Amino acid sequence: MSLNDLQRFRNLFAYEKVDRCVYWGAPAPWAETLERWKKEGYDPTKPLPHPDDGRIVHSTWFFPHPPFERKIIAEDEDTITYINHEGIVMRERKDFPDSSMPQFIRFPVETREEFRQFRKERFRANLEERIGPNYREILSSYQDRDCPLIIIADRWGGFFGGVRAMVGVERACLLFYDDPAFLEEMMDSIADFLIEMMDKIVQYTDVDVFGFWEDMAYKTGPLVGPELYRKFALPRYKRVVDFLRSKGVKYISLDSDGNIYSLIPIWLDAGINVLYPFEVQAGMDVVKVRKEFGKELRMWGGIDKRALAQSREAIDAELRRVEPLVKEGGYIPCLDHSIPPDVPYDNYLYYAEKLWELVNSL
């Protein structure tokens, strides 16, 4: 039995027979990690021992458009303060800005009037500008694909994440109490935008996975109480999910770091059936999640990246921990986040080889 990457993905998530599990083992290292690995023998021009199963992922189509013009506001020896493409004023380190947390100084929306102008100017479903003038040809070409098509709305595709991107974390949390009507107006606009975008996309191609993005939890729990979040977000999730299902999108995913146990029932009630990345250091355990919530919830991620910084024995133990899910199906084993610079290159190579053995052990 031999399947292409699309058939394998679909069969795996349908709990049907596969030739092996999906392999997503390619690294996502920090910039500092790459610098270390190059000193340890990594050559970025050479192919990896086991290339990932193919997947077409688009995660930039839903950002504010037109993007804000990057404008430098201040600069010193170590940092730079600027307006980014989302309209956020942020201060970043000059060395390795992608792997250090910026300081967020101002967000693009502070008032209703600013939000309504923002929505009018940058929440337009203009595919010819977001994808390209030949968007019809691009999307239609995916009908002949041999791997899954995954469309992620990323930072603007959620009912906490999208609000947070406009007003900041603290204001997003307080709006649930201080101005729920304004919060609902923003949530409804996000839902409208997601539906309008996807309604145009599915005219030209089917889609395997649509992805929400939230990142709304820290180490011990969510930033908003589950009951309160259910009240506001569930109706909007359901509206988008019901629309997507009516257009044939079978798998609806959601990405949130942190400890999300108390939010999972909300997302399942909305019809979301794929979650990731299950950060182990935040207490998430994919084996426990499967036992508690069952096979209707598909997953990817859940392998503790910190094991790669320890030893081969730690890597072996971590892969043994998730092995039952690999055998059961509906799960793609991969790291729970990008690889920090305390991971030796040899340890990554060992992990990749052992992961390859695991996905072929069915």
Residue ranges and their predicted role:
Residues 21-24, 33-42, 100-107, 120-125:
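Charged, low-complexity surface segments at secondary-structure and domain boundaries
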Residues 70-74, 78, 97:
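A structural signal for short, hydrophobic beta-strand segments that form beta-sheets
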Residues 17, 55, 74-76, 144-145:
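Short, solvent-exposed loop/edge-beta patches enriched in aromatic
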Residues 1-30, 81-83, 92, 114-362:
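Active-site loop segments of alpha/beta catalytic cores
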Residues 91-117:
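Short, surface-exposed, low-complexity cationic segments
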